[in-house]
Amino acid sequence: AAGLAALLKYPARFAGKKVGLVLGGGNIDPLLLASIIERGMVRAGRLARIKVSARDIPGSLAKITATVADAGANINEVHHQRAFTMLSAQNVEIELVIQTRGRDHIAQVLATLNAAGFAAAEQP
Protein backbone atom coordinates (compact mmCIF):
# COMPACT_ATOMS: atom_id res chain seq x y z
CA ALA A 1 0.00 0.00 0.00
CA ALA A 2 2.93 2.36 0.64
CA GLY A 3 4.07 2.16 -2.98
CA LEU A 4 0.59 3.01 -4.25
CA ALA A 5 0.34 5.88 -1.76
CA ALA A 6 3.61 7.36 -3.06
CA LEU A 7 2.44 7.02 -6.65
CA LEU A 8 -0.85 8.75 -5.88
CA LYS A 9 0.74 11.53 -3.82
CA TYR A 10 3.55 12.37 -6.28
CA PRO A 11 2.20 11.55 -9.77
CA ALA A 12 4.47 14.13 -11.46
CA ARG A 13 7.53 12.32 -10.15
CA PHE A 14 6.52 9.18 -12.03
CA ALA A 15 5.06 10.80 -15.17
CA GLY A 16 6.29 9.21 -18.39
CA LYS A 17 7.95 6.31 -16.58
CA LYS A 18 6.98 2.67 -16.48
CA VAL A 19 6.20 1.97 -12.85
CA GLY A 20 5.52 -1.38 -11.20
CA LEU A 21 4.13 -1.73 -7.70
CA VAL A 22 5.03 -4.67 -5.49
CA LEU A 23 2.16 -5.90 -3.40
CA GLY A 24 2.84 -7.96 -0.31
CA GLY A 25 0.37 -10.34 1.27
CA GLY A 26 1.30 -9.95 4.90
CA ASN A 27 -2.07 -8.55 5.86
CA ILE A 28 -4.27 -10.71 3.60
CA ASP A 29 -6.49 -13.23 5.39
CA PRO A 30 -5.45 -16.70 4.14
CA LEU A 31 -9.06 -17.94 4.06
CA LEU A 32 -10.11 -14.97 1.93
CA LEU A 33 -7.17 -15.58 -0.40
CA ALA A 34 -8.10 -19.29 -0.67
CA SER A 35 -11.69 -18.35 -1.49
CA ILE A 36 -10.55 -15.91 -4.19
CA ILE A 37 -8.27 -18.53 -5.75
CA GLU A 38 -10.99 -21.18 -5.65
CA ARG A 39 -13.55 -18.90 -7.31
CA GLY A 40 -10.98 -18.00 -9.95
CA MET A 41 -10.46 -21.70 -10.65
CA VAL A 42 -14.22 -22.13 -11.12
CA ARG A 43 -14.40 -19.20 -13.54
CA ALA A 44 -11.42 -20.57 -15.48
CA GLY A 45 -12.98 -24.02 -15.74
CA ARG A 46 -10.25 -25.56 -13.59
CA LEU A 47 -12.73 -26.54 -10.88
CA ALA A 48 -16.19 -27.87 -11.69
CA ARG A 49 -19.18 -29.27 -9.85
CA ILE A 50 -20.90 -32.12 -11.66
CA LYS A 51 -23.92 -34.24 -10.84
CA VAL A 52 -23.96 -37.93 -11.76
CA SER A 53 -27.04 -40.15 -11.54
CA ALA A 54 -26.46 -43.88 -11.19
CA ARG A 55 -27.99 -47.12 -9.99
CA ASP A 56 -27.54 -47.47 -6.23
CA ILE A 57 -25.66 -50.76 -6.30
CA PRO A 58 -22.28 -51.82 -4.92
CA GLY A 59 -19.48 -50.66 -7.19
CA SER A 60 -21.30 -47.73 -8.85
CA LEU A 61 -19.34 -45.09 -6.96
CA ALA A 62 -16.09 -46.95 -7.67
CA LYS A 63 -16.92 -47.06 -11.39
CA ILE A 64 -17.76 -43.34 -11.41
CA THR A 65 -14.54 -42.34 -9.66
CA ALA A 66 -12.48 -44.63 -11.92
CA THR A 67 -14.14 -43.12 -15.00
CA VAL A 68 -13.34 -39.59 -13.80
CA ALA A 69 -9.73 -40.62 -13.10
CA ASP A 70 -9.42 -42.28 -16.52
CA ALA A 71 -10.58 -38.98 -18.07
CA GLY A 72 -7.66 -37.26 -16.31
CA ALA A 73 -9.60 -35.27 -13.72
CA ASN A 74 -9.00 -35.21 -9.97
CA ILE A 75 -11.86 -35.46 -7.46
CA ASN A 76 -11.83 -32.87 -4.65
CA GLU A 77 -15.20 -33.59 -3.05
CA VAL A 78 -17.89 -36.28 -3.16
CA HIS A 79 -21.46 -35.85 -1.94
CA HIS A 80 -23.56 -38.99 -2.13
CA GLN A 81 -27.28 -38.16 -2.04
CA ARG A 82 -29.94 -40.81 -1.59
CA ALA A 83 -32.78 -39.16 0.30
CA PHE A 84 -33.05 -35.64 -1.17
CA THR A 85 -33.45 -36.51 -4.83
CA MET A 86 -36.23 -36.87 -7.35
CA LEU A 87 -34.67 -40.05 -8.74
CA SER A 88 -36.27 -43.45 -8.23
CA ALA A 89 -35.46 -45.35 -5.04
CA GLN A 90 -33.01 -47.59 -6.92
CA ASN A 91 -30.90 -44.65 -8.05
CA VAL A 92 -28.50 -42.28 -6.35
CA GLU A 93 -27.35 -38.78 -7.16
CA ILE A 94 -23.65 -38.13 -6.68
CA GLU A 95 -22.24 -34.62 -6.73
CA LEU A 96 -18.53 -34.32 -7.46
CA VAL A 97 -16.23 -31.32 -7.34
CA ILE A 98 -13.43 -32.04 -9.79
CA GLN A 99 -10.17 -30.38 -10.83
CA THR A 100 -9.80 -30.14 -14.60
CA ARG A 101 -7.56 -28.58 -17.23
CA GLY A 102 -10.32 -26.24 -18.45
CA ARG A 103 -13.77 -26.05 -20.05
CA ASP A 104 -12.96 -28.53 -22.83
CA HIS A 105 -11.72 -31.01 -20.26
CA ILE A 106 -14.96 -30.67 -18.26
CA ALA A 107 -16.90 -31.53 -21.42
CA GLN A 108 -14.59 -34.51 -22.00
CA VAL A 109 -15.15 -35.81 -18.44
CA LEU A 110 -18.93 -35.48 -18.84
CA ALA A 111 -18.86 -37.23 -22.22
CA THR A 112 -16.79 -40.06 -20.76
CA LEU A 113 -19.22 -40.51 -17.86
CA ASN A 114 -22.23 -40.44 -20.17
CA ALA A 115 -20.57 -42.95 -22.51
CA ALA A 116 -20.01 -45.22 -19.49
CA GLY A 117 -23.78 -45.29 -18.91
CA PHE A 118 -24.15 -42.58 -16.29
CA ALA A 119 -26.27 -39.44 -16.57
CA ALA A 120 -23.78 -36.64 -15.90
CA ALA A 121 -24.12 -32.86 -16.14
CA GLU A 122 -22.25 -29.79 -14.93
CA GLN A 123 -23.88 -27.89 -12.08
CA PRO A 124 -23.80 -24.09 -11.79
Q: What is each PLM-predicted segment?
A:
Residues A1-K17:
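Active-site-adjacent helical/loop segments in soluble small-molecule enzymes
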Residues A1-A2, G26-I28:
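Short glycine-rich anion-binding loops that position phosphate/pyrophosphate groups of nucleotides
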